[in-house]
Amino acid sequence: MNMSLSRIVKAAPLRRTTLAMALGALGALGAAPAAHADWNNQSIIKAGERQHGIHIKQSDGAGVRTATGTTIKVSGRQAQGVLLENPAAELRFQNGSVTSSGQLFDEGVRRFLGTVTVKAGKLVADHATLANVSDTRDDDGIALYVAGEQAQASIADSTLQGAGGVRVERGANVTVQRSTIVDGGLHIGTLQPLQPEDLPPSRVVLGDTSVTAVPASGAPAAVSVFGANELTVDGGHITGGRAAGVAAMDGAIVHLQRATIRRGDAPAGGAVPGGAVPGGAVPGGFGPLLDGWYGVDVSDSTVDLAQSIVEAPQLGAAIRAGRGARVTVSGGSLSAPHGNVIETGGGARRFPPPASPLSITLQAGARAQGRALLYRVLPEPVKLTLAGGAQGQGDIVATELPPIPGASSGPLDVALASQARWTGATRAVDSLSIDNATWVMTDNSNVGALRLASDGSVDFQQPAEAGRFKVLMVDTLAGSGLFRMNVFADLGLSDKLVVMRDASGQHRLWVRNSGSEPASANTMLLVQTPRGSAATFTLANKDGKVDIGTYRYRLAANGNGQWSLVGAKAPPAPKPAPQPGPQPGPQPPQPPQPPQRQPEAPAPQPPAGRELSAAANAAVNTGGVGLASTLWYAESNALSKRLGELRLNPDAGGAWGRGFAQRQQLDNRAGRRFDQKVAGFELGADHAVAVAGGRWHLGGLAGYTRGDRGFTGDGGGHTDSVHVGGYATYIANSGFYLDATLRASRLENDFKVAGSDGYAVKGKYRTHGVGASLEAGRRFAHADGWFLEPQAELAVFRVGGGAYRAANGLRVRDEGGSSVLGRLGLEVGKRIELAGGRQVQPYIKASVLQEFDGAGTVRTNGIAHRTELRGTRAELGLGMAAALGRGHSLYASYEYSKGPKLAMPWTFHAGYRYSW
């Protein structure tokens, strides 16, 4: 042996004793494996062809060898830092490093070698560094090469570095845990033509390991699996690769769990020749572009991704699936913001007829988002399935390239199931099935066969711009499902479903409400089917009606396969029973009349009997003078409810407070009947001024009132009223009284209702009102305490208007109005004297009230609605006033009122006055 190439040891001397040699010999003869410590804490440096740092040959015998704290450096041609060729040997390498820098690849026989090579036996490396620093070519830069059925490697908490990365083939088994593979990536197997068909599969397991392939390494993929070999990844990151993050070809099986696959910051290499693939423009107006990098590249192989993340930057694809690819994505996410989430057909290397079926499944909540969800490069049969709550975003498109000779062509089928959701458009899908899932259609689309089941739905996406309606054209429609659609009433446009050949099944249409008014009732066509089709359509909106602008609409068929929205009639009011009358007697013949001039045609009026939409009904019932006046009168009412009985305790003035609650039932003849509950309080103080024959009480007041409305089946609203005012009350010694008030109010009105599509519509505005009242009466008292008191009252109220736009776009203008209310009443009661100067005065009262005006106008989208509460109602009440002595007074009352337009089933008042 040439001494210049002899081994140089720069550490403790070798401890190979005679006993150790004897034990090794016994092991070779079949004795129990012995542990060797031949290379612990050594520095091994070799320079020379095939001068290996540690070489365990088959002739060395079985056993476990250890190399702890050892450093190995080799630099000769085909010199390997560690070479294992003994199937019965195991090398445990811990807390050390192995480095090689010589040429390792043997081009003559295409043989791979690595810094560490395991051809037979087992390598256990822990906290180690295996580095190939060769800079000649990637095949020379293999850090770890494990090949052969009897070869095994178990790596933990280590770093493996080299332009050729880690290579495993020919039935070897490798496990890598919590480690880092840098520069050249991981490569399992070889291309199918280069490996024998009867070779057993290699198996590699990565756990929480990072794999990186930098552009300088030339590695086409950070991780590649060729042939019938298997890779399992549980946690970790895969980064880089000239063309792909993970490549699986020719029968490979790859399981990726909790893995993250990214290209990293390196620029893309390996761009597709010729640039963008022609044809197949996305419906939105763009064509998919490629930059040649794929997160996962699959052909004739099976890849399962579970809770993993795949990101393709620039214009790449998260997954490229060639012929025979079977890809399942469970949870996790696929992202290609500027490119394709999935590209099919482009990864095929050969086209043997027929091509194997290609399937991609997203399930278990997987998320996929890109410019295109699926881009079919070649017309191969493709089946895309989204299930189990998976969500895909992006169009489904295909090139218009003709089939390649020798390649099979087939349909592009898409299945959505189990609460999956796809958001995008397509003109490329041959068949689409939606079973308990949703397709959100973002643009005009064409589908061959569409079948829906189990509440499957097609959602015509609500456009960002009004008027950008969408059309879905299908050859055939079957099953039973839901279509969510939009209308643009003011433009006379709507989304449309067009069936070209055959339509069957029972389907529902859910139409989003619109606040705009339709240009014409004849333009809201939603569905067109061939004449005589068996398909039926019904509205899924509440009560089978759609709120559009001011009115509600229903769905009707014209018998020619067209289904359109037409105006819905308001429910008819009950008709009174006819009364018998006298029978007319014979009438003399009438002389002929001269021709009369025909009157001019009246101006167009709002359609009669139409049912208001929820928003329009709420706006009409919130506006006008009727609602505001009922609040104002609840705050005002009679003197006795405000001040109590001033006659019980003549004073020089006082302070008082009262609370009240009332239920109102209103029918203003424009909106639907509704209920309102009113509650509030009022505080005031006055000063008494004695005059001849009586006294005046001059004072001021302020209060707050809240009205809570309920619109049956729709929602409700509120009014918050704050008011201030003054009053002057004259109490005469003769029993006559006069009470005058003046009050100003600020009213904050709002409503929130649910439209027929289930979405909330809100509206609010502010208005102001002012009113005055004058009440007079006289008490006729009897000696035993009984009294009779006729009363008369006149109140005038004026409320301003306001303009606003509801949340759904409905334009509302409240023009305000006036109310003039008169009341005639009679009160009967008894004054009862109690001990200590206290008094109580129970009473009953009956009144008749007449509203002389009470009319106002509310406009919705320019359509006028006349509201009015004019009419008569009766009122009954009872109450009690009590003087408790020392200036304290209490009073309370209950009332019931009934009229054709306004009823108050109950009204309660309670108050307290302190006199000084």
UniProtKB/Swiss-Prot annotation:
A motif (Cell attachment site) lies at residues 263-265, 706-708. The record marks N637, A638 as: Cleavage. Residues 648-916 form the Autotransporter domain. Residues 571-607 have a biased composition (Pro residues). Residues 564-613 are annotated as: Disordered. GO terms for cellular component: cell outer membrane; cell surface; extracellular region; periplasmic space. Residues 269-288 are annotated as: 4 X 5 AA tandem repeats of G-G-A-V-P. Residues 1-37 form the signal peptide. Sequence repeats lie at residues 269-273, 274-278, 279-283, 284-288. CDD domains: PL1_Passenger_AT. It holds the Pfam family Autotransporter. InterPro entries: Autotransporte_beta (IPR005546), Autotransporte_beta_dom_sf (IPR036709), Autotransporter_adhesion (IPR051551), Autotransporter_pectin_lyase_C (IPR012332), OM_autotransptr_brl_dom (IPR006315), Pectin_lyase_fold/virulence (IPR011050), Pertactin (IPR003992), Pertactin_central (IPR004899). SUPFAM superfamilies: Autotransporter, Pectin lyase-like. Residues 578-606 are annotated as: 6 X 3 AA repeats of P-Q-P. Gene3D superfamilies: 2.160.20.20, Autotransporter beta-domain. Monomer. Agglutinogen that binds to eukaryotic cells; a process mediated by the R-G-D sequence. Pertactin may have a role in bacterial adhesion, and thus play a role in virulence. May contribute to the disease state of whooping cough. The signal peptide, cleaved at the inner membrane, guides the autotransporter protein to the periplasmic space. Then, insertion of the C-terminal translocator domain in the outer membrane forms a hydrophilic pore for the translocation of the passenger domain to the bacterial cell surface, with subsequent cleavage. Synthesized only in the presence of low Mg(2+) concentrations. This is Pertactin autotransporter.
